[in-house]
């Protein structure tokens, strides 16, 4: 059984520039989340364009390949660049997930994240395209210190940059057991450690329950001027 749920909140900001969408096709479940950059609503347009384009990747119910996903990211980037003729500041991070019967594929640009849990334990996660992640790679800080790192929000890659390409793609076979995926913007993960996400997952039996706990934790711990925070949760129970 698969359950999926999403939420998006403007947090302490005047405008919500996050976008999250999902669709359950006949053979594929596709989820996409974008965190727009640019301010004044321009980022919202960018994240909407990216999500509208990428949600179609998998709609034909065929196996989504790395090459197909790259082409879809390219198409989204071209659309954003075209729109920049009017709104030249607009860019967006993106994280994409497609789950089928026995496999999953995901890709991302920027610092919106995907977490994969297997049988209740964190199994994998994306690495931010950011200055803070470079500091982790150089052993200057550990992963839990990213939210407090100076210049944490500075990212190297985002859709809306000329010649930008999909940087990170991962494909896995879904082994028997329980799987859970979380796609989220930085407004979520900067307040939730890997351990806390795992703890909240253990308290939930469906995606909606898990997401409710995540949102509650964010809203109870965020400052007044907190960033937009959005997430999509997918839970697969007892795949055999």
State the predicted function of each range.
Residues 1-240:
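PP2C/PPM-type serine/threonine phosphatase catalytic domain
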